[in-house]
Amino acid sequence: MSDKKVRARFAPSPTGQLHVGNARTALFNWLFARQQGGTMILRIEDTDLERSEARYEQQLLDDLKWMGINWDEGPDVGGPFPPYRQSDKIDVYREHAERLVAEGKAYYCFCSQADLDAYREQALKDHRPPIYPGTCRSVDPAEAKRRRDSGEAGAIRLRIPERPIRFHDIVHGDVEFSNEVVSDPIILRSSGVPVYNYVVVVDDAEMQITHVIRGDDHLSNTPKQVALYEALGWAVPEFAHLSTILGPDRERLSKRHGATSIATFREMGVLPEALVNYIALLGWAPTGGTREIFRPEELVKEFDLRRVTPSPAIFDFEKLYWLNRHYIKEAATYRIAKLARHYWDRMMIDKIAHRVGMPKLDPIHVAQWGASNEVDEWLSKVTALVVPSVNKLDELPERGKVFFDYDAAAALANPDNAEVLAAPKTTDVLAAFTTRIANESAPLTAERFKAIVNEVKTETGVKGKDLFHPIRIAVTGTHSGPEFDKLVPLIEEGASLNLPIAVKSVKERVAEFASARN
């Protein structure tokens, strides 16, 4: 690799959300720049004015920052090579294109779209590469000027040299393209709008980019870009084309596989350090060993572009969620409690909307249901209790059903509970347990609940799962879940709070269960 100070860039188009593939490209550029002590540049490629939107640009910036990816130069922080937004330098692209025409390295093409379609169709019929046949290559410059002056629209095409185009790729090695399969590319449309393959070269050269790290879907664009660098008299940067990311079915990763955008993973409750850790391992591996857990600072230290593989990477959702579970467990309790509040709020909003018969309820209608220290503290404790069993934070409401969704009739009808409820000793256990709970007048503590269970054990002679499973079903609706010594006090505390969706106390639950069972 070059000895020049590294200048790497991520250049997204603000035409949609940031997806896994582009996020990996951004991450690898960032890791490489930071590992090499170089400069990270963010450039917005928004020449597609019809599809580019400010909201997408802001979302891109937000997602990158959420991932921990920062930049030294960009549209929001400035830098020595402005502007960092392509739409602000259209005139620059036109000037360079006209210079190429003046030097005979490019020419005006007057072929209509119908002509181009006909060329392509015939080439395919003849089993030839469907490249532009060079119809306007020989048009005399004076004739081209006359036609343009008369109002005829013309695009500008680069003259591809009549020789193979070669370049070295850090991932793929030495690459060669025959000029017989590379068309003279349009660099400036007849409308005056420059095309991607052209503007990216101008920008990379003017911003002194030393390494172009991007997806291998751009590999076929590279010979045209190399030819442009040479025609413009600029140094060709080093290239590293990252492998394709495939879904579990070995097809190109897409929405049909599930979440693919960073915004969606964020909403699902995937932590940034988990996503960064996982994406970094898509097509790259550290030197030696089988280690899988890497903090961002460790990734920076370990990252080496030469260890990026050209083989496709498989996106394993379960592996990502396994990593996320690891990072959730390692995260500070207060941080997870703060993040979890979003999911509890959304759950409560949905429940209230369902209760009042509305398909959707704005958060303002919840009247700040948890705007109290007592509710905050209780939710933090609930989160701490159930979060070890989740892979993503959006699973919290499902685990929280033990507090908010107690339904005795549903518990009795649940086939998973059938074997326990039909056991010979269950009736005696539930009768003794129900009687004792009914006689309690104060909220149950962990110690008092344990004492009651021991009394039932002594009275009935039943122990182990034959004792605990029926009691758990009566209290929670299911025969598995958190330990009673932590669960029962939280149920009782929740029942004492003024929540819009009430938490039933243990006494209320057991009475409801007994009534439904009789």
UniProtKB/Swiss-Prot annotation:
Positions annotated to bind ATP: 255
S-S pairs: none
Function: Catalyzes the attachment of glutamate to tRNA(Glu) in a two-step reaction: glutamate is first activated by ATP to form Glu-AMP and then transferred to the acceptor end of tRNA(Glu).
A GO CC term attached to the entry: cytosol
Segments for region (Disordered): 130-150
Catalytic reaction equation(s): tRNA(Glu) + L-glutamate + ATP = L-glutamyl-tRNA(Glu) + AMP + diphosphate
Enzyme class at the top of the EC tree: ligase
A GO molecular function held by the record: ATP binding
Species of provenance: Koribacter versatilis (strain Ellin345)
InterPro entries assigned to the protein according to its UniProt record, in alphabetical order: aa-tRNA-synth_I_cd-bd, aa-tRNA-synth_I_codon-bd_sub2, aa-tRNA-synth_I_CS, aa_tRNA-synth_I_cd-bd_sf, Glu-tRNA-ligase_bac/mito, Glu/Gln-tRNA-synth, Glu/Gln-tRNA-synth_Ib_cat-dom, GluQ/Sye
Keyword Magnesium among record annotations: no
Motif 'HIGH' region in this chain: 12-22
Basic and acidic residues biased stretches: 140-150
Complexes and interactors: Monomer.
Main location: cytoplasm
Motif ('KMSKS' region): 252-256
Protein's cellular compartments: Cytoplasm
Coiled coil: none
UniProt-recorded name of the protein: Glutamate--tRNA ligase 1
Example GO biological process: glutamyl-tRNA aminoacylation
Enzyme Commission number: 6.1.1.17
Entry keywords, A to Z: Aminoacyl-tRNA synthetase, ATP-binding, Cytoplasm, Ligase, Nucleotide-binding, Protein biosynthesis
Similarity section: Belongs to the class-I aminoacyl-tRNA synthetase family. Glutamate--tRNA ligase type 1 subfamily.
A Pfam family that the UniProt record links to this protein: tRNA-synt_1c
